[in-house]
Amino acid sequence: MSRMVQCVKLGHEAEGLDRPPYPGALGARIYQEVSKEAWQGWLKHQTMLINEYRLSPIDPKSRTFLEKQMEAYFFGDGAQSPEGYVPPAPQDS
């Protein structure tokens, strides 16, 4: 049976993550309060941030920026989008 959490991002109970997705206290908090669905939303947002800002996940400044954005995405007022960012149009299957 799946572990259920009261997801802070979605605002309802949903399937929880299998393990903490990030080290430290932030990872533990995400594990306790964020659903798999919301985590997938973060991964898409993080990919957009990395691409638009040309971040390197191995650069300490980039990692600090992404960590702050992750915390804001789940527990704050929401993560930022790059100025002028327009999401790609949905593709027809």
From Swiss-Prot:
UniProt keyword annotations, A-Z: Iron
GO biological process: cellular response to oxidative stress
Function: Could be a mediator in iron transactions between iron acquisition and iron-requiring processes, such as synthesis and/or repair of Fe-S clusters in biosynthetic enzymes.
Protein name as catalogued: Probable Fe(2+)-trafficking protein
A GO MF label: iron ion binding
InterPro entries xrefs: Fe_traffick_prot_YggX, Fe_traffick_prot_YggX_sf
One Gene Ontology CC term in the entry: cytosol
Family assignment from sequence similarity: Belongs to the Fe(2+)-trafficking protein family.
PANTHER family per UniProt: FE(2+)-TRAFFICKING PROTEIN-RELATED
Species name: Acidithiobacillus ferrooxidans (strain ATCC 23270 / DSM 14882 / CIP 104768 / NCIMB 8455)
